[in-house]
Amino acid sequence: MESFKDEACAACEDVRWVPAWGKDRMRSMILERTDWCISRQRRWGLPIPVFYCKDCGKPICTPETIDAVSRLFEEKGSNAWFEMTAEEILPEGFTCPHCGKSAGFEQESDTLDGWFDSGSTHFASMERTQGFWPATMYLEGLDQYRGWFQSSLLTAVGALGRGAPFKECVTHGWTVDGQGRAMHKSLGNGVDPAEVFNKYGADLLRLWAGSSDYHVDVRCSDEIFKQLSQNYLKFRNTAKFCLDNLTDFDPNTLVAPADMLALDKWALTCLNALIVKVFTAYDNYEFHVVSHAVNDFCVVELSSFYFDIIKDRLYCDGAESLSRRSAQTALYLILDAMTRMFAPILAFTCDEIWLAMPHRTGDDERNVLLNEMVQPYTQYALSPEEMARWDRIAAVRTAVNGALEQARADKTIGKSLEAEVDLTVPAEDAFLSQMEEGALADLLIVSQVRVETGDSLSVTVRPAAGTKCQRCWKMLTSVGTVAGHEDLCPRCAAVVKSLPVVE
């Protein structure tokens, strides 16, 4: 080992270790190692191809003997070493290179260490195939720093005079039960994957693997699967909402960036950030970051904010109106991106979504994984200054939601659309008063809003004036002003008038 320790340690520098502390762990093991015992005393395994001269007692391992053993193994397999005599294996007329004797040889009875076998696979599987050496990545458990990882590195450096046979080395912990105990038959705490498939579906097991930080020991139990099933349903319901609202949408006619509404651009800017985060995580083999980021996006940005706000546009605006098609464009791009991004983890669910959703010309509709990965939609992105304003809108909305909850508890209102809100905002939020009439009310999901500037944010909730529109449920003083549609607001009356008459 002393003859190539420095080279082996230097080879560690050219490898990307995941986690990063793997490099120091490997280097320290190599530096502490003085010898490498590659022989084992057993009657099975790969023989050590060395002969001994009975006369002089010296070992014999020459190109000639190696060729003879190689031909033998190719013809009869390695067991022939134990079934034949040395004279039967060696070439006819062979003589000892040390003493010149032509008879009296015996073969080594020890076998090679199994780690030497596995550590040589890079030569057998990659060296002989053009362009495949070194491997992109080696993946194994934490114990393999002393096993396969190290033996592969040492054989490559010591025998071939090269660097490590892998560009990246990724390690994982062990699967343990919900209490952190090792799984044993005696404890009865093992988890059968087939039972998980039957109870929850294969994708939930994939989601468990993709949600776990595998660099440490990973817990596995039915309770964990139950909790994860909620995350799975959230993703599935998010996709269902998008699909339900895209049945009449042609993705080949996306709304142009210049025409898209600001809220929809906000959603796509959030999506862009998700795309960057997801692919950075994939590049770093941090699959749990992918799963948690997608779940947070579905819960925080979409379900709790964006989806609630756009429902009125999707359900009540004209089918071909810019406002509705703008929302549909954003929904389509969100669904398309999430399906492509999450397919490596939720392979079956994403394929199911892919088969159900509309597609642009050029997409391979057979399977999502046959398509290119998504890139950020920079053409729809808002500027950092614009996103900062949306952060303020979200903060105001949180305050308004709190006031609405209190008003509901006080029986002042029932649904939020029964409310009129008076907002006092600080100077930094004065832009809210400049928003298009009705736009802020839509963002807050109330019927009417009044805004004035003051020293700090305050919210007052009262019952909205006017009559309830029977189509959009908003309380407006304009309801009934359109002849023939006395129970509708002007917006809804115009949409209803435009609908085809069914005879």
Over which residues does each language-model region extend?
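Glycine-rich, acidic and aromatic/proline-enriched surface loops and short helix-turn segments
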Residues: 118-121, 202, 241, 300-308
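Residue-level signal for inorganic ion chemistry
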Residues: 172-173, 235, 302, 347, ...
